[in-house]
Structure formats: C-alpha cells, structure tokens
Amino acid sequence: MGPVELASCAFGQSSKISYLEMASAVCAVVNGGRLMQPYVVSDILGPEGEVIDHLSPICKRQVLKEETSRTMREMMEAVVLYGGGRNARIAGYRVGGKSGTSQKLDSADEKARIASFVAVAPIDDPQLLCLVCLDEPHSWPTAGGSLSAPVCAEVLEQTLVYKGIPRAAVPDTPASDAETSADLPEDGDSFDGA
C-alpha cells in the first residue's frame, strides 16, 4: 500500500461496505457504543398474524465507550443545527446526522459520486436511523447534506409521527441559514471564481 492509498484509507475512501454495515456502525456510535446484530425483521408472524418468534436485540460487542458515544451524539446534532446537515432539521425533534460525499471506486467517470446522509432521531434518545444514499446524482451541489439530508428529514419525520414519538423543545438554531452558510457557486461556476 502506497502513501496515497494509505491516506485515502484513513478517511474511508478506499473502503467498500454495505449500507446495512454503515447503518449498523452508526447505530453503535449513537447507542452507547454497542455494536448490535442487525435484523431486517423483529418478529416472525404465523398465518393468523400471531407472533411465532421475536428476535431480541443481541449485542455483538462494545466498540466505543459510553462517553465517546455521548460526545459523538453531540457532534452529530451540531452538524444538523449549525453545519452541513441543516437540511435534516425537523421541527420539534432533536436530530443528529452526518453527510458523506464519496467518489465511486469502480467508475470510469472520475466525477461519479455517491451523496449520502445518515440521520438519527431523537438524538438525545436514539430510536430511529435513516440512511439515504444517492448514486451519481445529476445536480449541483452533489453533497449529501444538500441532496440526501432533506430526504432523511422527510422519512424520519413521517416515521417519528407514525411511531407516536412526541415532539419536544429543541436547542436554539441560528436565526437564518444565511448567517452560517457559505456562498455556493452558481451552476457551472467553481469556488475559486474560475
């Protein structure tokens, strides 16, 4: 492994993981550091709708300290309140998130990207996680916080309401996005004005 590959590996650019693995890792980050066995279903039902088997949560191992998990939840909430994840805000819910914009490893097109955003709510008592990954979006900007975060917010809000999770007071947010956001280039322009 050369120096470029080593540097790329340090921030995950050369890693291939499934979306389920990514969601499972984020769950461990926010749930106190416990890596849980992922399941697609929680109950197996019989022909009359009765529960035949219930899959109880299984902790595979502790991967983070509780204190580290708490710090990560605070940082993820700051991403949504003040950073690139502002598009994931949901009125009355504390949301944490992390954007991701990655180059596609196996694409002949050097500009091919995956724009992703993972959001967790309520971040102070994590119950739901939503991961949205857009493969080769054809819009500008291609950042996960711009494209995928609003989808996460919509899915999470509808699910929070459906599950009966009540709205609550949320920390103050900036008066306007203009106070905290950078000026984005117009379509076709670059950041350096070229």
Enumerate the language-model features and the residues they cover:
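Active-site beta-strand/loop architecture of penicillin-binding DD-peptidases
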Residues: 1-59, 67, 76-166
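Short, highly charged C-terminal tails/helix-capping segments
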Residues: 166-194
